Amino acid sequence: MLSDALDPETSNVMFATLMKARRFAPLFWCQFLSAFNDNLVRNALVVLILFKIGSQNGPALVALAGAALVGPFFILSGLGGELADRYDKAAVAERLKFYEIAIAAVAAGGFLLQSVPLLFLALTGYGVIAALFGPIKYGILPVHLDIRELPSGNALIEGATFMAILLGTIVGGWAGAHPDAARILSVLTIALAVLSWMSAKLIPPSGEAAPHLLINRNPLASTLALVRELKSDKRLWSGGLITAWFWL
């Protein structure tokens, strides 16, 4: 029964079981390491802008850093969902995390050169990967988990995300202010990206949910189409608004 999964003792056992299972653990660590890296770079960039480079436009650049990371979600979420349905989710995840290593290399170059434009480019790249990976990390859970395990699986993925945000904020601030910040941050960003990719390679195949789906070449149009589809179902639309309000 689904209610059994909500029992604290049962949930604790299920958490431990999932964290040792290949059908879940690689996804957990892939999400954690990637989100940690995103927020590490963002907060280190904030420190670089405010305390090392210094600029009268500092506050505006800090706000822009947040927009660079979050902005791609508004445009690419629909495309991410289409890719997750058209292709094997595990294969797409592995490919995205491989590309993320190149983005981490750009971030490392930005830290070594103290180049704000390079770091903004990397941060936007991280946002693109995160937007495309989002539908995969949630869509693959029902494939590999039993319905009784879904509440625990969702809780662990969300917990990984928020723990990564917290740690990324702390470590990014500390590393950004360190005298040897450039070297520390360049090593960290690349190491985290490689570990995230290695985790993604261990995610079991999910199969193709909609192998004949045609990918819309206009990512904004696909996102708007998704919004219209959500609005047509009052229950889904209400759930979407509640979730969006939480993230705001």
Q: What name fits each language-model region?
A:
Residues 2-248:
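Alpha-helical transmembrane-bundle signature of multi-pass membrane transport and export proteins
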